[in-house]
Amino acid sequence: MLFSQQQVISDTRIWLGHNREDRQLIAIEDPYTLSLDELILSKIETAAQRVLMDASWSMLAPGTPVRTRLAWRDSPGRGMAVLPLPDDFMRLLSVRLSDWQRPARIITADNPSYCWQSSPFAGVRGNPSRPVAVITSYPSGMVAELYSSMAGPSVRLVEAQYVPCPRLIDGFINLPEPLYHDVVALVAQLTMQS
């Protein structure tokens, strides 16, 4: 849901106990001092990113579909697939290939089980009954390495949803409605720490 930056600023002021009628807060005209509204505005994206990274999957679903093509390390449909992630990627919610029995367990490259994914033994690495998606960085950008498939060239991407990095665009920010008040509370906390 889209929320205007003015709405976030207003709700944060209420959270802080500072409203527009407080003349002491808006009478300061020092050019080297940030106004309360400027401080709040500078914290919105940071607070939104923190809240969305910590939120449970159910609070974020449904995500934004990943609309890129799979690349294969070896032959198509066999072994590891590479799914390039969008530039605004922040968090992967779900990914599933057509030969997998369920969505993948999502880990990052610093997870100890990442080294197991290169094992020559199918029971150790991700497989169609226990798929694993590893979020990592390539020179071309962020990718999800998908372990692994065995069905051949017919394998396709069935589902891939992600959470985009929240940004203020034209004075609006897109946030899940259930998390809005958590974002406002964190904006207020970050503003008080400034």
What do the predicted segments below correspond to?
Residues 129-139:
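Short, exposed beta-strand/loop patches in secreted or surface proteins that constitute
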Residues 1-126, 139, 144, 149-194:
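Glycine-enriched, solvent-exposed interface loops adjoining structured elements
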